[in-house]
């Protein structure tokens, strides 16, 4: 029997992470690098990707990290990145679709009003879906399609607990706001996009099952990042474990889903939310 830890080893494989300059994006890169993968660190601007690489290199000086610019909303941009990598002899074995716009909940006048469903701007809807959902589809078309042609690969879509449940708008309420229509809310796009990613996961898992490509999703809960204490208190009341996630708590799950440790798993959504979605 193989030594179980070796099934998590990603040495010799190349992973590409979209939106890698963000809070969790850098954690996904670190997780893959820890497991031995070469990681292509991508973001909308090359400077963002390079900044992420520099920050990660301080903690992981031996990590094999390469910064690449990708606009995930543009098929031409995704194809160009794929061609640049191919020109360097780089084959992407693992795709992590992480790029997204996480609209912030705010009570600022004007911004608050436009975040409510009744007044939600169509251009904002289109922009956020283009990044978070269409972008995942385009990257899967290009990089996943190449995996299917080779007969091997892994795609991991980063969803959310809000792709399993709806946002509880009560946790965003402000006591000093008296008019209901002026209360801040979590905008509609985030939850819709994350639900869509889970659907895309199931579709691609069955579509490419006979081509050796596994496709799974992970739905993380909220990560503590020095948020407003009142908000944290309201949110943690909804979580059986009584706390938000630590920044690095999803690393092992990413390693599991991207490695041979999950070799008989596809089309699944791994929910890691401290129990919030089952309460």
Where are these regions (language model features)?
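The beta1-alpha1 cofactor-binding region of Rossmann-like NAD(H)/NADP(H)-dependent oxidoreductases
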Residues: 46-47, 69-81, 122, 247-249
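Amphipathic alpha-helical dimer-interface segment in Rossmann-like NAD(P)H-dependent oxidoreductases
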Residues: 83, 87, 100, 122, ...
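Catalytic loop of short-chain dehydrogenase/reductase
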Residues: 116-122, 156-196, 201-210
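Short, small/polar-rich loop/turn modules that mediate ligand/substrate recognition or access, typified
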Residues: 209, 214, 265-267
